């Protein structure tokens, strides 16, 4: 109460921020007459002027008023569109590394041009991030004329582009693209084998559209580049036949309750668990099928894989529904985004879940994958020097933006007052009663000539509602993942009088629903439209537009509350854009997912006290409050999950940064021979220490073991025992120096044979391949560690601290293995001696004075195989083409001279 009163007197933090923004906008507005008087050439010259001022040391932010005034004036001339003051405020917020909450229809696409232009002046590149390829392409094409007028280039980064197209897109001043594509390009760049293969420049400024969708909804989903692992499709099919034999046990309030079921389902945590009875039953079944030994336990280390398959099959059959969580198309299981209702082609669930669902649906089972590289959106976007975002609904997640990304949220006022009527929720006892009420509401709105947008939370629900409307004879359009291709066309005409559109969640987000329909879409559908046709279309649209405005605007119907209040607000936000009239209402039932899982007891109690009858709805602030509290609980739980994910991923992220930084240095270095020499000395020191301990008596030395190790790991046969026998004063340090000296000499000889440049390139190639192989294995080890780390809590240990400690140990081991394997491969390479016949042939064909043969492909193969070799095992050397010729042997040409005095001179 006191806080509210205090805020009312001095204003909230947001109010004070908006007040400060208005002062800067005033400065920009004062420049408008001056910039309006400039000729096109003079206005365009401003870009060059700004860049010169930056080069002379002027701060970027000091250019803001003039740069924004330039963009506003250019927009007036190119698009005949003038940035509103609230859009100017939005641009300032975005330049200040903050999140701008701008309501639907306030012109976020035009707003983005302001900070994009200003930050592109630095020449470091601006990335404008959208949620799908359609929006990226649309926004890039729309903004290109404006930026071209100002002398800037615009690129578009889409999936499926060639390497050259991507390089060209990233080389532009401003690049539009999707969050997925930017993230995957980053990972691919860090798997490149040459600096010129990379496409991205250093990450400077990212402006994220629909920032809540990208940084919050998708934060739990890591981007993963993977390769195929072992095939276990038959096992998935077999285990899937087990699940129908299992009986579900209903959870009871009493912890002592012991049911007879085989498994329980926790819908909140999206997990299924075997009961004690279930474990006994599953063990017996697996033994019957010959998948487990008679004396084996399901929980023994040897059977962890089987348990993993059983858990995946159980979750697939009890928690994941077709046309809700995924669709099956062309014998492929495609995930449906729970937040947008869009399909996510190419994405797969991990931990065998996707394969279990494929087995359940009888679809082709793809191999499990091994992670080659991964990163979460949380960590990818934190790599940018500057990060900002915009959305219509950020305030409910302001705390998370601040905590995770360090981004403040600024809620901007609308250009015109909001007049949408958000009516209270209506709650029914059953789903059938709810749908009956929705149909009646739709009939009323259609009769009033009002367009209706019905939001559902799944494809299944959208098709159920569509079937009911079809039976009732109500014409409508369905917009869900199955009709993704028609998305833009359906949304464009969703504002026509009496139009009824059913959409899953926020499908169609990013495209405004214009009251009366989109006249632009009608014109675009015509080939070479005449001026008369355009005038007719606009005239007819105006009549429809006025009719819809008069009847009350777009009516929004929510068929269920989403887990997040923000998603509900996004649905409501489709109506009432730019001061248009509109209304919204949510219809709920006690059988809805959210109500059943989180709010059922409290609301059910209220409804029973009120004596609800069939078909009767309850509309009361208490009910709305209870539902909102349920949503807050879910939001809090999801925030904890995301925060927990980040805390664990931060450990891997620190390691990722080190590896990628070292990898990039490798790519950009022409010569790493000094690094290799240091590594070689370090590795040899460690190896020698294992057999000749520092400051130890010679009786404890294992000379035979050292000779064997040097032979197998470094391909050098050194008679160390003979050295000691010949010189009894040869102490430890001298032995060490002599071993290293011999190996260095051997390596120098290889360099003579192979050539300096070739060996330098090969060293780099071996280092990169070995690093990539070990990093891949390290990621698998980290994933394995992560999956079981929570069990440390039972031993009264902090799982996060244990994870950090063990992850560091794994990382240290990986770095040591890297040194060991690189040195071993480089020491074991065999360079082919010259083939005399080939030399003679070459000499006859040309005047070339020198020929060397070097099998690069064979050496590459050795580098790849090294990761699989086991310590102590000898590796076959390269096979030489032809017999080796000693320098004192007779020359094969038949001259009778020694080889070294004849064709051997060519060496």
From Swiss-Prot:
Principal localisation: membrane
Chain residues that bind ATP: 87, 105-109, 512
Amino acids binding Zn(2+): 891, 893, 902-903
Transcription is among the record's keywords: no
Cellular compartment(s): Cell inner membrane; Cytoplasm
SMART domains in UniProt: SecA_DEAD, SecA_PP_bind
PANTHER family recorded: CHLOROPLAST PROTEIN-TRANSPORTING ATPASE, SECA INNER MEMBRANE COMPONENT OF SEC PROTEIN SECRETION SYSTEM
Upper classification of the organism: Bacteria, Pseudomonadati, Pseudomonadota, Gammaproteobacteria, Aeromonadales
GO process annotations (BP): intracellular protein transmembrane transport; protein import; protein targeting; protein transport by the Sec complex
A Pfam cross-reference name: P-loop_SecA
Organism field: Tolumonas auensis (strain DSM 9187 / NBRC 110442 / TA 4)
UniProt-listed Gene3D superfamilies: Helical scaffold and wing domains of SecA, P-loop containing nucleotide triphosphate hydrolases, SecA, preprotein cross-linking domain
Membrane topology: Peripheral membrane protein
GO molecular function, one term: ATP binding
A cellular-component GO term for this protein: plasma membrane
Protein name: Protein translocase subunit SecA
Family stated for the protein in its record: Belongs to the SecA family.
EC number: 7.4.2.8
UniProt keyword list: ATP-binding, Cell inner membrane, Cell membrane, Cytoplasm, Membrane, Metal-binding, Nucleotide-binding, Protein transport, Translocase, Translocation, Transport, Zinc
Catalytic activity: ATP + H2O + cellular proteinSide 1 = ADP + phosphate + cellular proteinSide 2
Assembly information from the UniProt record: Monomer and homodimer. Part of the essential Sec protein translocation apparatus which comprises SecA, SecYEG and auxiliary proteins SecDF-YajC and YidC.
Cofactors: Zn(2+)
Task performed by this protein: Part of the Sec protein translocase complex. Interacts with the SecYEG preprotein conducting channel. Has a central role in coupling the hydrolysis of ATP to the transfer of proteins into and across the cell membrane, serving both as a receptor for the preprotein-SecB complex and as an ATP-driven molecular motor driving the stepwise translocation of polypeptide chains across the membrane.
Cofactor stoichiometry and binding remark: May bind 1 zinc ion per subunit.
């Amino acid at each position: 109460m006191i806080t509210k009163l205090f805020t009312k007197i001095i204003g909230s933090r947001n109010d004070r921020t908006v007040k400060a923004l208005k002062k800067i906008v005033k400065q920009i507005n004062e420049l408008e007459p001056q910039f309006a008087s400039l000729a096109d050439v003079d206005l365009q010259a401003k870009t060059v002027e700004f860049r010169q001022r930056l080069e002379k040391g002027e701060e970027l932010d000091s250019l803001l008023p003039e740069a924004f005034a330039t963009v506003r004036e250019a927009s007036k001339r190119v698009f005949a569109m003038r940035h509103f003051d609230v859009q100017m405020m939005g641009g300032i917020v975005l330049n200040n590394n903050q999140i701008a909450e701008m309501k639907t229809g306030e012109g976020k696409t035009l707003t983005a041009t302001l900070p994009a232009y200003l930050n592109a002046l630095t020449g470091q590149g601006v990335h404008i991030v959208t949620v799908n390829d359609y929006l990226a392409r649309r926004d890039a094409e729309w903004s290109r004329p404006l930026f071209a007028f100002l002398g800037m280039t615009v690129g578009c980064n889409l999936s499926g582009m060639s390497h050259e197209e991507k390089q060209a897109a990233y080389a532009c001043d401003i690049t539009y693209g999707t969050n997925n594509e930017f993230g995957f390009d980053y990972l691919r760049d860090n798997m490149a084998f040459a600096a010129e293969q990379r496409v991205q420049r250093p990450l400077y400024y990212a402006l994220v559209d629909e920032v809540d969708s990208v940084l919050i909804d998708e934060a739990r989903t890591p981007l993963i580049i993977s390769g195929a692992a072992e095939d276990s499709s038959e096992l998935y099919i077999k285990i899937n036949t087990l699940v129908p034999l299992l009986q579900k046990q209903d959870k009871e309030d009493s912890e002592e309750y012991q049911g007879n079921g085989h498994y329980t389902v926790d819908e909140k945590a999206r997990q299924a668990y075997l009961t004690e009875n279930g474990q006994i039953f599953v063990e017996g079944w697996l033994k019957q099928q010959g998948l487990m030994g008679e004396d084996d336990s399901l929980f023994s280390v040897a059977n962890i894989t089987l348990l993993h398959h059983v858990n995946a099959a159980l979750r697939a059959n009890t928690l994941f529904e077709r046309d809700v969580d995924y669709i099956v198309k062309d014998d492929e299981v495609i995930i449906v985004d729970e937040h947008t209702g869009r399909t996510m082609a190419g994405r797969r669930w991990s931990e065998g879940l996707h394969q279990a669902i494929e087995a359940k649906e009888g679809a082709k089972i793809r191999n499990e994958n091994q992670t080659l590289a991964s990163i979460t959106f949380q960590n990818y976007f934190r790599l940018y020097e500057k990060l900002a975002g915009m959305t219509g609904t950020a305030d409910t997640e302001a705390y998370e933006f601040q905590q995770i990304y360090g981004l403040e949220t600024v809620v901007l006022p609308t250009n015109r007052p909001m007049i949408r009527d958000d009516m209270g929720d209506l709650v029914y006892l059953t789903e059938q009663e709810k749908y009956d009420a929705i149909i009646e509401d739709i009939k009323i709105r259609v009769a009033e000539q009002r367009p209706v947008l019905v939001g559902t939370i799944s494809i299944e629900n959208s098709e159920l509602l569509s079937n009911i409307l079809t039976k009732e004879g109500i014409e409508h359009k369905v917009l869900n993942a199955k009709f993704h291709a028609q998305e833009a066309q359906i949304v464009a005409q969703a504002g026509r009088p009496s139009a009824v559109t059913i959409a899953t969640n926020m499908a169609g987000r990013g495209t405004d629903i214009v009251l009366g329909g989109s006249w632009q879409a009608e014109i675009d559908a015509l080939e070479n439209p005449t001026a008369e046709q355009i005038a007719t279309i606009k005239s007819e649209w105006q009549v429809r537009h006025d009719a819809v405005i008069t009847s009350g605007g777009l009516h929004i119907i929510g068929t269920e509350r989403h887990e997040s209040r923000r998603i509900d607000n996004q649905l409501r936000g489709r109506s009432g854009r730019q001061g248009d009239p509109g209304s919204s209402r949510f219809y709920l039932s006690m059988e809805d997912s959210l109500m059943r899982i989180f709010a059922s007891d409290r609301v059910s109690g209220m409804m029973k006290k009120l004596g609800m009858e069939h078909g009767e709805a309850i509309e009361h602030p208490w009910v709305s409050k209870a539902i909102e509290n349920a949503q807050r609980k879910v939001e809090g739980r999801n925030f904890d999950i995301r925060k927990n994910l980040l805390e664990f991923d931060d450990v891997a992220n620190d390691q990722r940064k080190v590896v990628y930084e070292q990898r990039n240095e490798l790519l950009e270095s022409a010569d790493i021979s000094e690094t290799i020499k240091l590594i070689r000395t370090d590795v040899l020191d460690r190896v020698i220490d294992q057999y000749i301990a520092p400051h130890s008596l010679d009786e404890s030395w294992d000379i035979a073991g050292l000779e064997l190790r040097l032979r197998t790991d470094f391909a050098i046969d050194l008679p160390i025992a003979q050295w000691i026998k010949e010189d009894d004063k040869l102490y430890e340090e001298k032995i060490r120096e002599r071993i290293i000296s011999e190996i260095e000499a051997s390596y120098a000889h290889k360099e003579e044979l192979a050539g300096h440049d070739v060996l330098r390139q090969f060293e780099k190639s071996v280092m990169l391949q070995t690093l990539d192989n070990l990093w891949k294995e390290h990621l698998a080890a980290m994933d394995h560690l992560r999956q079981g780390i929570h069990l440390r809590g039972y031993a009264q240990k902090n799982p996060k601290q244990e994870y950090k400690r063990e992850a560091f140990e794994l990382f240290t081991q990986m770095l040591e293995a890297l040194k060991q394997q690189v040195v071993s491969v480089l020491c074991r390479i065999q360079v082919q001696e010259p083939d005399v016949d080939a030399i003679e042939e070459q000499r006859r064909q040309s005047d070339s004075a020198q020929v060397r043969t070097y099998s690069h492909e064979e050496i590459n193969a050795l580098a790849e195989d090294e990761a699989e070799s086991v310590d102590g095992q000898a590796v076959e050397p390269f096979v030489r083409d032809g017999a080796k010729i000693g320098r004192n042997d007779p020359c094969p040409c038949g001259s009778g001279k020694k080889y070294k005095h004849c064709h051997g001179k060519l060496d």
